[in-house]
Amino acid sequence: MSALLAAHDLVAGFPDRPRVLDTVNLAIGRGTRLALLGANGSGKTTLLSCLAGSLKPTGGAVERDGAPIDWGRKGLREHRRHVQMVLQDPDDQLFSADVSQDVSFGPMNLGLEPDEVHARVREALTLLGADHLAERATHQLSYGERKRVATAGAVAMRPDVLMLDEPTAGLDPLGVHQMRDALDRLTDAGTTIVMATHDVALALDWADEVAIVCDATVHQGAPEALLSDADLVARSHLDTPWPLALAAALGLSARPRNLDEAVAALAPALGEFAATHDAAASVPGSDDTTNTDEETR
């Protein structure tokens, strides 16, 4: 299967750090859920910006549907019809006085009829669980609400690829659930999702593929295989997800996928521990609280 979006030998950086990314290769298939992992400053946001057409690389190429993107104004406008990026800080993407105006900004710039713009706004807000915010002023929203509205603005463009920089950061558990539910529905509808995150457990549970940014390059593969690479995980300053750590500690052939499976996996070891403890407790003198004759005199 050919990649919908790809980086080939990509080099990117800034004047004070010219090679944040050095000879990066990445291929993202249509409909993929890809989690982008890495330490702070590793280059995750830089890579997203290059793929979105917001930052021109100094070397290599970004391709969409097998063709290099055109970095001219017209070419970038066309690219952004297909690839949208949501920044980590929602305030960097909220410009209008109220929510509906803000979400409608992108579709209006596509030259759509007002009825179509309205339909897209309602659809995107509903998908993000934010339809009740449509008439609210953006400055009145909580951080989590602003994050959902900023995401709705990108969703309203109906892109082929939606890229999100730390979409669950700063959200409460309900907000995380709502965001994940929205992303799942988007992928079910065929949207390709690329999520930069520090949440390794989320990446393991949610993603079809993982790409780890480490030492200015990218390692891409299946989540379980890549996150089981102890050396790569350590060099990337990541934590081993608890399901993989538990599977390794117990010698399991498959990682537990949820808490119930983890408890079931632990049951034999806990049973053996309890039996050993009970046996030891039944031996005279084995209880530390037992007093000797000398102590009781």
Swiss-Prot record:
GO terms of molecular function: ATP binding; ATP hydrolysis activity; ATPase-coupled transmembrane transporter activity
- Gene Ontology cellular-component terms listed: ATP-binding cassette (ABC) transporter complex
Organism, scientific name: Propionibacterium freudenreichii subsp. shermanii
Q: Which domain of life is it from?
A: Bacteria
What EC identifiers does the entry list? 7.-.-.-
Cite the CDD domains for this sequence: ABC_cobalt_CbiO_domain1
Cite the residue spans of the region called Disordered.
277-297
> What positions does the domain ABC transporter occupy?
5-240
Q: Which SUPFAM superfamilies match?
A: P-loop containing nucleoside triphosphate hydrolases
Tell me where in or outside the cell this protein is found: Cell membrane
Membrane topology designation: Peripheral membrane protein
Class of this enzyme: translocase
Q: Which family does it belong to?
A: Belongs to the ABC transporter superfamily.
Indicate whether Nucleotide-binding appears among the record's keywords. yes
Where ATP binds, per the record, is at 38-45
**Keyword vocabulary terms for this entry:** ATP-binding, Cell membrane, Membrane, Nucleotide-binding, Translocase, Transport
Function of the protein: Probably part of an ABC transporter complex. Responsible for energy coupling to the transport system.
Some GO term, biological process aspect, for this entry: which one?
A: cobalt ion transport
One Pfam family of this protein, by short name? ABC_tran
By what name is this protein known?
Answer: Putative ABC transporter ATP-binding protein in cobA 5'region
